[in-house]
Amino acid sequence: MKGKSLFNVFAVLAIFSLALSACGGNGSPEQPAGDGPKVTSAGFECPEPNPRVEVTSTELNLFVWTEYFPQDMLECFELVYGITLNRDEYSSNEEMYAKVSAGGTAYDLVQPTDYIVPLMIRQGLVQELDHAQLPNMKNIDSNWMDQPFDPGNKYSLPYLAGTDAIVVNTATVETIPTSWADLWNPEYAGRMVFIDDSRATIGLTLVTLGYDPNTTNPDELEEAKNKLLELVPNIKLFDSYSPKTALIAGDVDLGMVWTGEAFIANQENPDIQYIYPEEGPVLWQDNWLILKDSSHLDAVYAWLNYTMQGDVFWLTIRDFQYTNPNQAALDYAKANEPDVYNAYADSPITNPPPEVVAKGFGIEDVGEATPLYDNIWVEVKGGN
């Protein structure tokens, strides 16, 4: 599906989910690698690597999103391979890019969202994948591969995907928003949480003005900046570490969050609802990239293959309910963990309806216009 967009991917998967419905290194236990089953601190029995990659490295350095990895997955990799995972976390693409582009890090793998991938490729920060060392790449649904931001997946592999949309506590908010534009309602002053995502926030603001969310027009961006500054009094906090926490605690009543955060908040409190705005949600995909100076390539390929196994990656469906590109994981969960699978497959949060996807928009690389967006965000964040 050359040249396809995330819009097409979500559309295909939304239709597929309807068909299914119609049919019905951190704190791991100290067990040495070797013979016999390995069990995590939570009692999960670790699947054997298939295939097992030969490694000599003793560590792997990850720079990844916060709250994005099942603890059992992390522990199992350490247990079955005897490799220590060193994991640093970031809460925005911009934070990750700034640190990596400055140099001097020892990271092996990072996890950028789609629009950052071309930038990192252009900057020479990453290396090509060796597909011959990735037999478990076959487990990824082909609809998520060969995206415009990395044709042929020369550099990137999908991890998870999802949407940004409106979240609202229907028990505490009198006027329920149905559009991005509604969030400017003064009734919401000091009551909102927003993920700390410059491009998504500026993009949705552009959409409310009738502009392309990826515009490079300075006049349109200036107009968006001024409108976004009007929204700032409504935002109590920007939080990409765990925006659901403030919602569940009642510190805020509504805002803009990711798929997985909304799912968990709704599970904790059914009054917290995820609303797809009339203008459409933001559609996104997070991906693995190997940094050019990685010194643990054997461990990198061991990690990628192990975590792409269906009997391992299904843990993301259990613990972090984002849209899942790994077909083997979905098949495994459906056959072996039906409650987990059904909660995922039946949710409009993890599987947006086709009519919602049709309105959705993605964030794209804007090239030389990137500093214009950066400057807007500095000014906006200076007011909050």
Q: What are the language-model segments listed below?
A:
Residues 35-119, 245:
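Early extracytoplasmic/lumenal segment of secretory-pathway proteins
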Residues 60-70, 95, 106-251:
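Extracytoplasmic ligand-binding site segments that recognize negatively charged/polar headgroups
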Residues 162, 221-230, 268-294, 338-341:
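Periplasmic-binding protein-like
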Residues 121-128, 150-154, 234, 264-276, ...:
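Ligand-binding "clamshell"
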Residues 291-357:
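Mature extracytoplasmic/periplasmic domains
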Residues 1-59, 384:
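Short, low-complexity disordered leader/linker segments with a strong preference
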Residues 116-119, 248, 254-271:
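A ligand-binding cleft/hinge motif common to bilobed small-molecule-binding domains
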